[in-house]
Amino acid sequence: MRTKKRTKEMLPIFDQKKVAFIGAGSMAEGMISGIVRANKIPKQNICVTNRSNTERLAELELQYGIKGASPNQICIEDMDVLILAMKPKDAESALSSLKTRIQPHQLILSVLAGITTSFIEQSLLNQQPVVRVMPNTSSMIGASATAIALGKYVSEDLQKLAEALLGCMGEVYTIQENQMDIFTGIAGSGPAYFYYLMEFIEKTGEEAGLDKQLSRSIGAQTLLGAAKMLMETGEQPEVLRDNITSPNGTTAAGLQALKKSGGGEAISQAIKHAAKRSKEISDDIEKTAAPLSGVIK
C-alpha cells in the first residue's frame, strides 16, 4: 500500500474555518471529540445536525461545547467543510436534500462506509471536491490511523485542509480508493483486535494472581511501548522481535506457543475477513443504489 503521511507539525493554520457534521452517531462523536481536544478550531465554528434526534444533538452540544441544531437551523451555505456522517443507507436522500444548498467551493469529507467519491460527485454535481475518509475509534483521543482517498476535484489546498482537520484526530494516510477495504481490515477494525488480545492478557494475569486492573495496565503499557518502538526506531517488526528472543528463553517459549496455536495466521485471517466484509458491504450498497449503479465500489 503506497501512502503519504502528513504529521501534525506540518499542518496548516485553520484560519476560522467552519465545519458541519451531517449525522450525529458514534463516528461523528469520535471525530468531534478529537477535533475539540486538538483545540485548533473554535468550538463555536463546529456544528452537528441530524434528521430528528434533538436529544442526541443536545447531548453532543453539552458534552463538547459545539452547536447542535436541526438541518433547517444550520446555514449550510456558510460552512467551509461538510462532513457526511449519516448512515450509508440514508446517503442518497441526504445528498438529494443537500445538493441545492452546497456551494462549489465547499470541501466534502465522507465517512460513509462503502460509498465512493464518484457516487457523491455525481449526486451533488458542480464538480464538488470530495474526500473519502476512514478513521478509527481512537480518533476520540487524537490517536486515530485515518485514511483519505481524494476525489477528482480536490485541489492541493483542499487536500491540505482535509489533512489538517483530520490530523487533529491522529495520523493521516493518503491512499488509493481501491485500498480502502484492506485499510479498513487493518486500521478500521484493528483496535478491536488489540482489545480482544487485551481481554486475554488481563484474564491470564488475573488467573495468575495479579489484580485485574493491574494486569490490564501492564498489558496496555506493553502494547503502547511496543507500538512506540516500531514507530520511533523505524526497525522492522521481525528485527525487534528477534532482539528480545533468546534461544530457549521465556520469549521463545511464548512465541512457540503462539505459533502452535495459529496466532500469526489468526491475525492475518482477521484482517482478510474484515476487508472482505468491507467489500461485501460496498457491494450491497451498490445493489440498492440502482439509479447510480456502478459508481459505488
Curated annotation (Swiss-Prot):
GO molecular function terms listed in the Swiss-Prot or TrEMBL record: pyrroline-5-carboxylate reductase activity
Name the Gene3D superfamilies on file: NAD(P)-binding Rossmann-like Domain, ProC C-terminal domain-like
**Pathway this chain belongs to:** Amino-acid biosynthesis; L-proline biosynthesis; L-proline from L-glutamate 5-semialdehyde: step 1/1
**Which compartments is it annotated to reside in?**
Cytoplasm
Question: What's its catalytic activity?
Answer: L-proline + NADP(+) = (S)-1-pyrroline-5-carboxylate + NADPH + 2 H(+); L-proline + NAD(+) = (S)-1-pyrroline-5-carboxylate + NADH + 2 H(+)
What Gene Ontology terms for biological process does this UniProt record contain? L-proline biosynthetic process
Name the principal localization, coarsely classed: cytoplasm
Task: Report if keyword Oxidoreductase is assigned.
Answer: yes
Q: Name one GO cellular component term.
A: cytoplasm
| Record's keyword terms, sorted | Amino-acid biosynthesis, Cytoplasm, NADP, Oxidoreductase, Proline biosynthesis
Positions of disulphide bridges: none
E.C. number, please? Answer: 1.5.1.2
Q: Which Pfam families match?
A: F420_oxidored, P5CR_dimer
Alphabetical list of HAMAP family matching this protein: P5C_reductase
Q: What does this protein do?
A: Catalyzes the reduction of 1-pyrroline-5-carboxylate (PCA) to L-proline.
Family label: Belongs to the pyrroline-5-carboxylate reductase family.
Kindly provide the name given to this protein in its UniProt entry. Answer: Pyrroline-5-carboxylate reductase 1
